[in-house]
Amino acid sequence: MSLLPELRYPTVTEVVTSARALAARRPALCTLRQIGRSRAGRPLHLLSVGHARRAVLVVAGAHSNEPTGGATLLDVAERVLNERELRLGTSWHFLLCADPDGASLHITPAPRSLFDYHLGFFRPAGHEQPEWSPAVLPPDRLPPETRALTGVIDELRPYLQVTLHGTDLGGSWVQLTKDIPGLAEPFAKSAAGLNIPVETGASDAAGWPASGPGVHVMPAPGAGAAYPSMPDDARNSTWYHAHRYGGLTAIVEVPMWASDLVDDPAPHPAPAVALRRLAGRLLQDARQVERVLADATPRLPDVEGPLLRASKWGLELVPGLAADWMHTPPADNTRAYVGSVDAFARRLPLRAASMLLRVLLEQDDRAAPRLERLVATWSEAFADRFRARWVPLEHQIEHQSRTVVAAAIHARARAV
């Protein structure tokens, strides 16, 4: 997985070091090159294995708080090197980290609990995320990380792009920009064999058709949004850039902590009532964070740093999202979906509070102890509500890696 003696999430530097070692080991097959720089000047690296024109592109690190992808990417690269049949007529290309600036700010390589995870939490504001910025920014304002990613897609014209994502607590699921027939079965078998629940009602894919449990296909343009207030649209993200060349994108999500409550297909007795209750709690929780932010802001020397930008951006989403849950019919009536919305409603204020807490702790601000108690309480309640259990890191990597390979094999049959 990495050059580390212990099993933990590798840093970007460690992923690059491991990729460089792979390239040195098989120089006839592998190349490692720089394809751009981040806003802060950090290099963006692409590892390529094989020389065939037909290509798979694997992207790690698009969300800095989802750390499994770097380790999975290295595992898939090893498999491709060791299994010749995966390279037959196909080259593989690995963007080692799509957002190295964000990765430098998320600092929980071996979290012991959800509270520990949130103490080092960072996830940038939406317009600063490389995959999502095209959905909210005009082309002339796209960050260099986005331009590097779309440039690689333009160069390689992959039949499949796989982007490696994760969730803090829940189950595993796949989002597809076009269906991949045959993927659902190996995905489900892999998850079951590793005791990872399949998240059948993921709020990220609310209202999308499913080609199998936990495998969601994005609706066609013009389909109504489950959450009308959300500023982004996946159909305007980099996920759809591969469509210009006849390709598609698979987003593979794996959990750090699993919950066996996320795959319950039973109908919820009152989903609309439940969503209205969750909306009320979301508003109440967000107000607690906003009060701390308003109190502390005059004392802070820099109110435009990345942690505060991201914290405030998350809080700004809350009123519209709460209104969506109150006034829009539920996209799904299952217990799994209502549970996923419950988790979403916990994450937004918890993440905003966590990033604000990091700023306050750095300044030794008097509001920090109170906010730290709130982050601890919310983290514990989140874990208790969903009966969180840690997924061994090797299982996170194995399941995500298997799903990447299965997607490539089944999408290749479609691409022929």
Question: Predicted segment positions?
Answer:
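Short glycine- and acidic-rich boundary segments immediately preceding or forming the N-terminal edge
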Residues: 1-44
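Flexible, small-residue-rich helix->loop connector segments that border functional cores
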Residues: 76-89
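Short hydrophobic beta-strand that contains or immediately precedes a catalytic carboxylate
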Residues: 57-60
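C-terminal accessory segments enriched in acidic
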Residues: 2-9, 181-416
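Di-metal (Zn2+ and/or Mg2+/Mn2+) metal-binding site signature of metallo-dependent hydrolases
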Residues: 63-71
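Conserved beta-strand scaffold positions in the cores of enzyme catalytic domains, especially
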Residues: 32, 46, 94, 161, ...
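Active-site/substrate-binding loop(s) of hydrolase catalytic cores
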Residues: 53-55, 68-69, 86-184, 188, ...
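Short beta-strand-to-loop junctions in surface cap/lid or active-site-entrance loops
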Residues: 45-53
